From Swiss-Prot:
Cell wall formation. It catalyses: UDP-N-acetyl-alpha-D-muramate + L-alanine + ATP = UDP-N-acetyl-alpha-D-muramoyl-L-alanine + ADP + phosphate + H(+). GO terms for cellular component: cytoplasm. This is UDP-N-acetylmuramate--L-alanine ligase. The keyword Cell division applies. SUPFAM superfamilies: MurCD N-terminal domain (SSF51984), MurD-like peptide ligases, catalytic domain (SSF53623), MurD-like peptide ligases, peptide-binding domain (SSF53244). It comes from the Bacteria. It comes from Rickettsia felis (strain ATCC VR-1525 / URRWXCal2) (Rickettsia azadi). The gene is murC. Keywords: ATP-binding, Cell cycle, Cell division, Cell shape, Cell wall biogenesis/degradation, Cytoplasm, Ligase, Nucleotide-binding, Peptidoglycan synthesis. Its main location: cytoplasm. Gene3D superfamilies: Mur ligase, C-terminal domain, Mur-like, catalytic domain, NAD(P)-binding Rossmann-like Domain. Its EC number is 6.3.2.8. It is found in: Cytoplasm.
Length: 478
C-alpha cells in the first residue's frame, strides 16, 4: 500500500517522529506530511526558523534529543546527519520502531506523482525554486520540497493540488538515486561529500545512476558547461537528455546577450531541440537575482518548461514572480554606502561564483569586495584544502573565521589559521586575514567599508545568524 493512499483506508497511521526536524530537508517533508493530514512531531538540538515555523502549524517540537521524545510514536524518520548514538535512534531500535531514512520518505511522497528531482553539487535550491515558479505560471499547482526557504512562500515546502512534485535531491549519501523521478536535473558535479563516497569516481557513478534510473518516458536536463557533466552526458545513450549552458555552443539551450546588476540578470535564450524544427530565440528574459550561476540555474528551468510546452509567456511570467531564496546573495545590511550580503556558499566552487557576482557589481560601482568566510566542517576543509586556497581571487580583502564544526571532531593541521597562512605564503592573495572571533567582523566592516563595496558573508554555519544581526549592530555605530 502506498503512503498517499494510507489515509483512504480504515487503517490509522500513527505519529511520525523526525529526528533533526529543524534541518531544511527534514522540515520540508514534515510540513508536507502534516498538510496531508498525518500526525507529525520532531526533535532538534536548537530552535531555529524551521522549528518555529512548524510549531506555528501545531507540530510538536522537542528541543534536545531524549528517549522519552518517542514514547508514543509509530515511525521515526532520520537523515544521514543523525549519528547512530542518538538516544532516540537507540530507543527506536530497542522498541523495534521502524526507522525510515529521509530520502525513503521523500521517495514515498513522489511515487505517485510526476516528479522533477533537482540534483547537483551547487545550485539545487535556486533551481528547484525557479522550476516551481514556471509550473505555477503555467497554471499548474505543484507540491514543492526544497532545500531552502523560498522568499515569496516563507517556507521550503508547500502542498499543491496537481499531480506534479518538484523536489531538491540531496546527493550527500547516494540515496537520491532511488528517488522515483520523471525528470532529473543535474546542475554540476564537483568533489563533495567524499567522506561518504571516498572517491570522486564513485560520486560521478551515483549521478549516472540518477539519470539511468529514470523511466523510459522521462528525461534529464544537464549543464554541459561543466566538463564532468558533459562527459557523463556523452556516456549515457539510453535516456533522453536536454543540455544547457552559456559557453557550450552545442547545448540545446544557450543564454547570450547577458547583463547583470545587483538586483537582476537579463539575457536572451537560443533553443535548438532535436525534436523541434529550426531554432527559437527568446529575448529579454529577466530573473530578479544576479550572477552567471543563476542564469545557468534558470536555463535548467527553461529546459523543463520548453519540454513540457509551457510557452514563452509562462516562462517569462514565472521568472518575474521569482523572489529569490533565503541565503542566496541576500542583502541584509548597508553601512557607509556599502552593501552586506548573506550567502550560503561553503564549497570553493560556490565561493568562486558568489565572489564573481560580487566583483561584477562592485566594479560597476567603483567599489571593492570584502569576503568574510566561515568554513563548514573539518572534513570538507581537509578534502578541499588546496581548492579553498584558490577560490578567493575575486575578493580584494579576505577574512576567514574558525571552522564551524557541525558536530565533527577537529582534524590535526586543518585550521582556518593554517589556511590563511598557506594563502599568504603561496602568494595566492596578499590580503588574507584570520578572524579570531566572528564578532570582530563588525570592526572589519566599520574600518574598511566604503561607497560601492560589496561585503559578502559566506558559510553554512552560524554566520548567517550573525549577518542578519549586522544591520542593528552597524546602525548603532553610525
Amino acid at each position: 500500500m502506498l503512503l498517499l493512499e494510507f489515509k483512504k483506508t480504515n487503517q490509522t497511521l500513527e505519529t511520525i517522529h523526525f529526528i533533526g526536524i529543524g534541518g531544511v530537508g527534514m522540515s520540508g517533508i514534515a510540513e508536507i506530511l502534516h498538510n496531508l493530514g498525518y500526525k507529525v512531531q520532531g526533535s532538534d538540538l536548537v530552535e531555529n526558523y524551521n522549528t518555529k515555523r512548524l510549531e506555528s502549524y501545531g507540530i510538536k517540537i522537542f528541543l534536545g534529543h531524549a528517549e522519552q521524545n518517542i514514547t508514543n510514536v509509530s515511525y521515526v524518520v532520520i537523515s544521514s546527519a543523525i549519528n547512530s548514538n542518538n538516544p532516540e535512534i537507540k530507543e527506536a531500535l530497542e522498541r523495534k520502531i521502524p526507522i525510515i531514512r529521509r530520502a525513503e520518505m521523500l521517495a514515498e511522497l513522489m511515487r505517485l506523482k510526476c516528479s522533477v528531482a533537482v540534483s547537483g553539487s551547487h545550485g539545487k535550491t535556486t533551481t528547484t525554486s525557479l522550476v516551481a515558479c514556471l509550473f505555477e505560471a503555467a497554471g499548474l499547482c505543484p507540491t514543492v520540497i526544497n532545500g531552502g526557504i523560498i522568499n515569496n512562500k516563507s517556507t521550503n515546502a508547500y502542498l499543491g493540488s496537481s499531480n506534479y512534485l518538484i523536489a531538491e535531491a540531496d546527493e550527500s549519501d547516494a540515496t537520491f538515486i532511488h528517488i522515483p523521478s520523471t525528470i532529473a536535473i543535474i546542475t554540476n558535479i564537483d568533489p563533495e561529500h567524499l567522506d561518504y563516497y571516498k572517491d570522486f569516481e564513485t560520486l560521478i557513478g551515483a549521478f549516472k545512476s540518477f539519470i539511468t534510473n529514470l523511466p523510459f518516458y522521462g528525461f534529464a536536463v544537464c549543464c554541459i558547461d561543466h566538463k564532468i557533466v558533459r562527459k557523463l552526458v556523452d556516456d549515457i545513450t539510453e535516456r533522453k537528455i536536454v543540455t544547457y549552458g552559456i559557453d557550450s555552443e552545442d547545448a540545446h539551450i544557450i543564454a547570450f546577450n547577458i547583463n547583470t546588476d545587483i538586483a537582476s540578470s537579463t539575457f536572451d535564450v537560443k533553443i535548438s531541440l532535436p525534436n523541434v524544427l529550426g531554432t527559437t530565440i527568446i529575448e529579454k528574459i529577466t530573473i530578479p537575482t544576479p550572477g552567471r550561476h543563476n542564469i545557468l540555474n534558470s536555463l535548467a528551468a527553461i529546459a523543463v518548461g520548453i519540454e513540457l510546452d509551457f510557452g514563452i509567456k509562462a516562462i517569462k511570467n514565472g521568472f518575474n514572480n521569482f523572489k529569490g531564496v533565503k541565503r542566496r546573495f541576500t542583502k541584509v545590511a548597508e553601512y557607509n554606502k556599502a552593501v552586506v550580503i548573506d550567502d550560503y556558499a561553503h564549497h570553493p566552487e560556490e565561493i568562486k561564483a558568489t565572489l564573481a557576482t560580487a566583483k561584477n557589481i562592485a566594479d560597476k560601482q567603483n567599489g571593492k569586495v570584502i569576503a568574510i568566510f566561515q568554513p563548514h566542517r573539518y572534513s570538507r576543509m581537509q578534502h578541499l584544502f588546496d581548492d579553498f586556497m584558490l577560490c578567493f581571487n575575486d575578493a580584494d580583502m579576505i577574512y576567514i573565521t574558525d571552522i564551524y564544526a557541525a558536530g565533527e571532531e577537529p582534524i590535526e593541521g586543518i585550521t582556518s589559521q593554517n589556511l590563511v597562512n598557506k594563502i599568504t605564503k603561496n602568494k595566492h592573495h596578499d590580503q588574507a586575514n584570520f578572524l579570531a572571533e566572528l564578532d570582530d567582523a563588525v570592526e572589519v566592516i566599520i574600518d574598511n567599508a566604503s561607497s560601492g563595496d560589496m561585503i559578502i558573508m559566506m558559510g553554512a554555519g552560524n554566520i548567517s545568524s550573525f549577518a542578519n544581526e549586522l544591520d542593528g549592530r552597524l546602525s548603532s555605530r553610525t
